[in-house]
């Protein structure tokens, strides 16, 4: 496992570099083909290379991604390493989610007959899964159950729900004027944006844990000009599709407050919520496996972050997420995994795959 992990972490694969993604897919392909005893293939959608292995008789889809948020060149300064004093592995993308891929390979290798296991490793999850969504839906529907090898929650908890995500850009157009000579002739886009930000913040509902957060904002061109243009990005998240649709409708109802200003809202729901009921059956199976391995009880949490599990859960397909590595701090310079937990996580996934493929379709 460690040899593969070292190679995979040191094989840079930022979401924005087609060449590096292709190289990473080519690294994983022979490992996956060997584990499954059948060929995996690199499938290209646009410039993105995804790794696909379709089962002859699918019962479960192992879903993950090999793209990372780390730019080319990061490995030169921060290559894979293990701190032997605490048995912690470090490196770009190790927790999210290259260790999860290595564990999945080991889990599949433990199966006497993997002919009911499909695998999809995508290359665009970190940037919204635009080119892989159709593949995800197709393979998930064929299999009827999905296990997602994204990182675990704290302590190794699996994820049985995730908030849905909507993203927006609110653009304001006013009228430029000299800030000192003729401010009264302008329509201040910054002031209009301030009104909109207050209204946007009010769309959230803390009682329902629905967050609507203005994030990146910009306005104006020079310090002595009434701003003609302004914009703000908005991140919205909710546990239920009903709430997310309410937010979406409210965002698209925003109207200008200043005479002469124009407000345009671009965006919408990107990842529907992963609602907890969809995970119930697979979580019960995983918890039973954990007990049989002596690593129970298996904790379960809901997460505010999204994954491709949102997409399969929204289709009503039984889905369990967070079956990847135990560690912490994804997307940060202290990203790490607990090396000594990797074998047990592979065993947990292997046991779950064995139970899932050894019976009729999960309901």
Residue ranges of predicted features:
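Acidic/histidine-rich catalytic neighborhood of metal-dependent amide-processing enzymes
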Residues: 97-165, 205, 363
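Flexible, glycine/proline-enriched loop segments at strand-loop-helix junctions
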Residues: 91-95, 122-123, 179-187
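Metal-dependent amide/peptide-bond hydrolase catalytic core
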Residues: 13, 70, 151-152, 160, ...
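Active-site metal-coordination/substrate-binding segment of hydrolases
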Residues: 59-121, 333, 338, 344
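Short beta-strand segments
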Residues: 63-64, 120-122, 147-150, 171-173, ...
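Acidic/His- and Gly-rich active-site-bordering loop/insert found
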Residues: 1-92
